UniProtKB/Swiss-Prot annotation:
Species annotation: Bacillus cereus (strain ATCC 10987 / NRS 248)
PANTHER family listed in its UniProt record: FORMAMIDOPYRIMIDINE-DNA GLYCOSYLASE
Pfam families in UniProt: Fapy_DNA_glyco, H2TH, zf-FPG_IleRS
Reactions this protein catalyses: Hydrolysis of DNA containing ring-opened 7-methylguanine residues, releasing 2,6-diamino-4-hydroxy-5-(N-methyl)formamidopyrimidine; 2'-deoxyribonucleotide-(2'-deoxyribose 5'-phosphate)-2'-deoxyribonucleotide-DNA = a 3'-end 2'-deoxyribonucleotide-(2,3-dehydro-2,3-deoxyribose 5'-phosphate)-DNA + a 5'-end 5'-phospho-2'-deoxyribonucleoside-DNA + H(+)
SUPFAM superfamilies on file: Glucocorticoid receptor-like (DNA-binding domain), N-terminal domain of MutM-like DNA repair proteins, S13-like H2TH domain
Binding site for DNA: H93, R112
InterPro entries membership: DNA_glyclase/AP_lyase_DNA-bd, DNA_glyclase_Znf_dom_DNA_BS, Formamido-pyr_DNA_Glyclase, FPG_cat, MutM-like_N-ter, Ribosomal_uS13-like_H2TH, Znf_DNA_glyclase/AP_lyase, Znf_FPG/IleRS
Keyword DNA repair included in the entry's annotation: yes
Cofactor note text: Binds 1 zinc ion per subunit.
Zinc fingers, FPG-type class: 240-274
Name by which UniProt lists this protein: Formamidopyrimidine-DNA glycosylase
Cofactors named for this entry: Zn(2+)
Keyword Lyase: yes
Length: 276
């Protein structure tokens, strides 16, 4: 699933490709992707004649701002936005096509069909689901070690499960939580309330630095991720633990292990990340 670094790189490349283009028509071939309004035909009619003004990101969501509305899109596991010419073949996994007046088309492709789109009037998007209950952005001033400490000390859930909760902070998924906890030297099954202030400080620092580095490297291409210009990321080359079960730890040489935490495959070093 694309996490913050991947979605941010999609946002940047997509904004360069489609800002200023006017939507002539919308073709939806898999209506279940459109969650709001509940009729894809209405979604289509509302967007006709709208011009894309800018594209923002909130957590793992893309926000496409048009003249009067905002399309809130979640890519889920395999979603991709790619620009095409009108005479190019249409991939069988293309489920939404935004046809522009200049003859180009923005295709939303999704092999798994798990992605979603919500359409809101401008100004309504942040106060309604799916954005309303999201936590702070990792790079915002609102996220501090103190913010994390106040919330982590109130829960006995395992720290990996807590960091995956987008209500605490946004953007971390399975890949980057494993990497953050390795850099923090915290076992993924530690109870959040057991963490010291110094350990929480390490988690905060690792979150900001890991995500920042991943954004600069274009994200991580583990399976099929590409940005909207068709480019893969390169941060996968710097991963320390994710997907590396059975390999030696880069720090101590111990063989990395994999377990399941909160239903998610979890990679860690049993020496560098002791379960206290």
């Amino acid at each position: 699933m694309p996490e913050l670094p991947e979605v941010e790189n999609v946002r940047r490349t997509l904004e360069n490709l489609v800002t200023g283009k006017t939507i002539e028509d919308v073709i939806v071939t898999y209506p279940k992707i459109v969650k709001r309004p509940d009729d894809a035909k209405i979604f289509k009619e509302m967007l006709k004649g709208e011009t894309i003004e800018n594209i923002k990101r909130r957590g793992k969501f893309l926000l496409l701002y048009v003249t009067n509305y905002v399309i809130v899109s979640h890519l889920r596991m395999e979603g991709k936005f790619l620009l095409h010419q009108e005479d190019e073949p249409i991939d069988k996994h293309t489920h939404v096509r935004f046809l522009f007046t200049d003859g180009t088309e923005l295709h939303y492709k999704d092999v798994r069909k798990f992605g979603t789109m919500h359409l809101f009037k401008k100004g309504e998007e942040m106060n309604q689901m799916p954005l309303a209950d999201l936590g702070p952005e990792p790079f915002d001033a609102e996220l501090t070690p103190q913010y994390l400490q106040e919330r982590l000390q109130k829960t006995n859930r395992k720290i990996k499960v807590v960091l995956l909760d987008q209500r605490l902070l946004v953007g971390l998924g399975n890949i980057y939580v494993d990497e953050v906890l390795f850099r923090s030297q915290i076992h993924p099954e530690r109870e959040a309330s057991s963490l010291t202030a110094e350990e929480i400080e390490r988690i905060y620092e690792a979150t900001v630095t890991t995500l920042g580095e991943a954004v600069k490297r274009g994200g991580s291409t583990i399976r099929t991720y590409i940005n909207s210009q068709g480019q893969i990321g390169s941060f996968q080359e710097l991963l320390n633990v994710y997907g590396k079960k059975g390999e030696p730890c880069v720090t101590c040489g111990t063989i990395l292990e994999k377990t399941v935490v909160g239903g998610r495959g979890t990679h860690y070093c049993p020496i560098c990340q002791p379960r206290i």
